[in-house]
Amino acid sequence: MAKKVDGGMRAKRLTGDIVTYIILASMCVIWLMPFFWVIMQSFRDGVGQYISTFLPQAYTLNNYKALFTDFSVINFPRMFMNTFFVACCSCVISTFFVLAVSYSLSRVKWKMRKPYMNMAMVITLFPGFMSMVAVYFILKALGMTEGDKIYLSLIICYSSGAGVGFHVMKGYMDTIPKALDEAAMIDGCTRWQIFTKITLPLCKPMIVYQVITSFMGPWMDFVFAKVIAGAKSQYWTVSIGLFNMLEKEYVEVWFVRFCAGAVLVSIPIAVLYLLTQKMYQEAMSGAVKG
């Protein structure tokens, strides 16, 4: 009797596992299908938005080549470098801001600490684009919406609010025993040495997370870049360029190039994720061993 019960339980468990894996596989296919379609369309030989078949009839690399040779509508290489420069600068500044604010809130007791945390919590409840118009007119009054100052304006917009996004990093720093800081201070270490030699190495997983999010924000943003850069195409980012490819007068010819551009734009994020994932795994394995 016990064997029959065990056999029935195993059969139910096996059936449940099969159903679970089928559902997960179906969801994976549904999720990956649009990405696969865009990649295939980027190699399609021809023009137009729609074709009668899911896969292209003929393949070519001309769509990728056109992005770097045909500047009649957009200058894709320049937009790519504009975005890369702004995203890298914003990433470095934002990560530094978050680390500094998180450390001061986690380890240093000061008078306005709790009011600042409460204020930051309220501010993060509102989307950033609500301040877009005010930010634009402030930058315009300062003369920072013309010429190369547009780069600085974009970097300021993307990194200036990083100081209020400290919650995840601070929560992680709170888990680090303060006894480590006290022992280091007894040995004669300064606050800066404790921060750089002890806290930062232990925060590697969260630093990786912060780097990824700080880079992806400027890389994928459209609203602030469009408002600040305006019609000055030499300062456009890739999001504006890709959007411009889908304008009514260009979409028939540039749709397949749009797909090629979308593939190229995803490469830096994929590379960053792969590199930081390795660092994250190494940091976590080191923490477990420690």
Where are these regions (language model features)?
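Short, Lys/Arg-rich, polar N-terminal cytosolic tail immediately upstream
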Residues: 1-11
